[in-house]
Amino acid sequence: MTVCRPVTWAFAAALMVAAVGHARAESPEAGGRERQWYLVRASKDFDAGRFERALVNFEAAARLSEAPLPEEAVRRWGIAASEAGWPLAAYVRLSQYLSAMPGAAGREQIQVRIDRARRVLLDIAARQSRVIVLTETRHSWEASGERQVIRLVAKDGRATVEALSGVRVTAPAWERAGQIEEGAYVGLIARLLDSPALLDEYPPQILDPNEPGPRHAVVLRLVLGPEERVRQALRGEPFDKLQALAQLILDFSRTVQTAP
């Protein structure tokens, strides 16, 4: 089985820059007013039981600012996703809400929704899901360059792993590919869902070409059915947490038993 090698640093960097958010011509004040407008619309839709529309408006509001949404908006966002049948969005937002508000009223009901969403996601994981990890350290005086690409895929109960690492992905120092046991793969997905690195929100990080020292990048993309969550980081605590999660996935890819 041939390992796919579609990923380069340029792609990873472009993905990160694109995810930083689109540049807007309007002032921050105008962006704040637009965000508030979406929050008002989302709340009205939520109160009227139009959960799909509420979900869209909450997502639009979140994209308009680096600042996190108010906790109550996050709670409603998660419930709207739960009611509209989007388990990954429900799981992420409601988990974030309970993390921020551990003593919140109605915690038990929120936890029931989280647990239900998690069960659905693990069921989806075996049928249609992907985990993609890209990590890179650019060559510098302080460190040699290295790339790692990991791709785990499950479809209709069949799971596969493709992984490689080296200075160049076109000529990797190490690579592995094969079919793996479904239960092991779903167990990995469960660990990812429990990881704060997947659930945490933090301000976007922009690549600075003048930054001293070795430049690092890590991208994690988790796809479960029609939903996905992408996390990426370049420095600081967000990078450390996400890099640790990427290392967990790499260790899994190195050690998991493949079919002969």
Where are these regions (language model features)?
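Bacterial N-terminal signal peptides
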Residues: 9-18
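Short solvent-exposed coil/turn linkers within tandem alpha-helical repeat scaffolds
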Residues: 29, 61-69, 98-117, 146
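Alpha-helical segment of the N-proximal tetratricopeptide repeat
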Residues: 31-60, 64
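Short, charge-rich amphipathic alpha-helical segments embedded
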Residues: 58-82
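Short, well-ordered, aromatic-rich surface patches in folded extracellular/luminal domains
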Residues: 112-148, 197-260
